[in-house]
Amino acid sequence: MALCLAASGCGGEEGEDGGGEADRFDSTAAFELIDEQLALGQRPAGSPQLRRLGDRLVAELPQGRFEPVPGGLRNVAGTLPGPGPAIVIGAHYDTEAQPPGFVGANDGAAGTAAVVELARTLERELPDGHRDVRFVLFDGEEEPPGCPDARFEQCALRGSRAYAAAHAGELGELILLDYVANRGLRLPREGNSDPDLWAELREAAAAVGVADRFPEGRQPPIIDDHVPFLRAGIPAIDLIDFSYEHADTLEDTADKLDPDALDAVGEAVAELVIRRATP
């Protein structure tokens, strides 16, 4: 879940497009990891299911490791080391605790799979001498039971708040992947996202043939895992299609996803990171 701040809602229109013209990001492998996550069932922060998933994911990231989050939670992090400041590619890997049975195909699993596959892609594609690139899967993005919407930023976003507090001085930018694989994916700029970094993302998307997935315009501002970074003065963007009609429902399942949509996001983000990380 991310919290929309617009009184009129955050919906939009759908459309259909293909994947990217580049062939660096493997959406088939990413969808296999989505299926693995969904097979675990609901995966709220602190649950045995999320613990098992974290143990699986840490082995998939370069220099994979856990970083502690208050409350007994843990972020999963990896690094392709280089000179700073670091580029961070992030997503949350927990799911909502309610409703019972929620599996978060787009809200959690898709972004997680995209980050893991981007790590594989960039490990192959980045040139020698590249900037430090980090991959972080945030725990505790979803609000714990009893957290009112008015306090979402204070009691949710636990992993991203912890990571930003621990590493802010080392970071150059954050690229956050949230709802990034739904059918009809459209990603206008989210209202809190850094406009200059977003403009570079749109240029990268055009270069790999997926400009239609990133239309001009702006979504309302959303409280999501990028906000702790913005508050720390770090440019950050949030890739989230808040028109996704199955958000926060039991219908957020694998059949609502589109491999071409995730491929478009993966190719665009890979292009952006390669451009920014190349000396």
Segments and roles (model prediction):
Residues 5-9:
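C-terminal motif of bacterial Sec signal peptides marking the signal peptidase cleavage site
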Residues 43-45, 70-71, 83-84, 93-97, ...:
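Solvent-exposed loop/turn segments at secondary-structure junctions
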Residues 42, 173, 180-279:
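Active-site-adjacent substrate-binding region
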Residues 35-43, 58, 62-66, 117-128, ...:
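Sec-exported extracytoplasmic/periplasmic mature domains
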